[in-house]
Amino acid sequence: MSTGFNAQSFLRTVTSSAGVYRMYDVKGDVIYVGKAKDLKKRLSSYFRKNLGNVKTQALVSHIHHIDVTLTHSETDALLLENDYIKQYMPKYNVLLRDDKSYPYILLSQHEHPRLAYHRGPQREKGHYFGPYPNGGAVRESLHLMQKLFPIRQCDDLYYKSRTRPCLQYQLSRCSAPCVGKVSNAEYDEQVKLASLFLKGKDKQVISELVAKMEEAAEQQAYEQAARFRDQIMALRRVAEQQEVSGNTGDMDVIGVHYASGIACFHLLFIREGKIFGSRSYYPTVPAQTDIEEVLRSFLLQFYLNADIQRTIPKEVVISHHFEELHELEAAVSEALNKKFSIKTNVRADRASFLRLAITNATNAVMTRLSHKNTVEQRFVLLEEILELNAPIQRMECFDISHTMGESTVASCVVFNREGPHKAEYRRYNIEGITPGDDYAAMKQAISRRFDKIDASGKIPDILFIDGGLGQLRIAQQIVDEKFVNLDKAPQLIGVAKGESRKPGLETLIFGDTETSFSLEDDSPALHLIQHIRDESHRFAITGHRNRRQKTRNTSTLESIPGIGPKRRKALLQHLGGLQEVKGASVAELAKVPGISIEMAQTIHDALRG
């Protein structure tokens, strides 16, 4: 492909200064951003006669023009490069999409503080501990904290409504401050110890508890002394399991594995000398990108584009060394205005945890490659069976779900050559049809999916319909209408269940000819069809159940005079669900915020008939 770019003429205008360059294609899109301490030398390397790298060849073939920005230093160039990558998301750069927020444990500032899971803006007053790599790590920690410190974890609405201790008190996981089972002083002491524990000060917590145990024993308060003893033993067991080293502090340990175009960066988050958990990252890597660029790009984007809620440690240990490591170290330190070091040659505890991170990264890549190869083989076999002239790039499958015609939902799931593409999944709430009419539901769903389709839209190569010939005919009719003026249309295939409805006995039906065929029950191509069919079924059922529950909750309560969305929500949250609301007494209903005794009587009468 020729874009008319005159490289020699351009290079005559480039100086040997440090700076950043942006490469554009003929449409004006930025396709690559790079930096160099010597721009002339770096840019000249793209236009040598013998370019060994396939990625570079492809990149150069699409260059229409190049913009250059000079900087005072290589550190400035690194920072500007990162800003441009974040702004333009160029197709030939390594891109890290880390758009998930990080969860924390919140210790609130109430009279009786609570421990809670928190994700998002830190608006509530209190102490935030973390960040944790994922929600599972937070929930695991909260479960552990319940066993160690009898502090409430219930929400305020539930806490204020209690008239007697809940099950957590019976399990010795909460001291029931809601009903005065513990003094404020005792509760505050446990809150203080929990805070110290979350800060990693296990030894101080244990020392204070030992002193309290001895004091209780001296005063012959043996039951209280036994409680402190049990708490100390539990804390010691946990401390032994979590302890990394006495002097590690805050640190990220990163194991890297890169193979066949898939890169995994597995991070161990160590804060206050404890492992908070781990998380794997998979940056988007253009084909034939060398490992040095993958490493540099990941570290640059991960630490410079960090969510404001994610704390950056002073030390990072990584499994690979690369040429620009020290320049990147300086750039991050300058941008964050704090000391930041990257180490690759480590010993003792750090080496042990680095080996663990590398093992996890390697296993993650191998698993992805195995899955990728398996899915690819299934696609190839399906192409052979269907005698297609071109590879399948996109498949979709539709299914309908309802209960006796109630709350009908249609699902559309999407598979590409790597398997399920969940970002493209869609659900359609079906309206205005005769309840239970699956044909009308399918017609509405297919019509809405392809309502404004054109040649530039996302057209599936194959469209599976989970159903028999009747539903397939409806779908084929709609597709014929919507694609009448387009050169390409999807191949429709119905997936009808066999006589006994057992997997492996499915009958497949072509939509255009209505001819049917079957595949062997051990055929990988059939397994691929079953996978997308089962996924569409699952997605439709979960959507239907959610819609049905919402409809039933809403219609039952909001049919009562005086009950709107706000009061309905308060009733369901406070009492735990519709069945609990139905079973509540007038007195219990009246304890819900916003519900008077008169309104409680009205609700009680309406629900009891």
Curated annotation (Swiss-Prot):
Highest taxon listed in the record's lineage: Bacteria
CDD domains per record: GIY-YIG_UvrC_Cho
SUPFAM superfamilies given in the database record: C-terminal UvrC-binding domain of UvrB (SSF46600), GIY-YIG endonuclease (SSF82771), RuvA domain 2-like (SSF47781)
Predominant location category: cytoplasm
Keywords, sorted A to Z: Cytoplasm, DNA damage, DNA excision, DNA repair, Excision nuclease, SOS response
Record's keyword annotation contains DNA damage: yes
UniProt GO cellular component terms: cytoplasm; excinuclease repair complex
A single GO BP: nucleotide-excision repair
An example Gene Ontology molecular-function term: excinuclease ABC activity
Positions of the UVR domain: 203-238
Annotated ranges, domain GIY-YIG: 16-94
Compartments reported by the entry: Cytoplasm
Family matches, as HAMAP family: UvrC (MF_00203)
Function in brief: The UvrABC repair system catalyzes the recognition and processing of DNA lesions. UvrC both incises the 5' and 3' sides of the lesion. The N-terminal half is responsible for the 3' incision and the C-terminal half is responsible for the 5' incision.
Assembly information from the UniProt record: Interacts with UvrB in an incision complex.
Protein's name according to its UniProt entry: UvrABC system protein C
Gene it is expressed from: uvrC
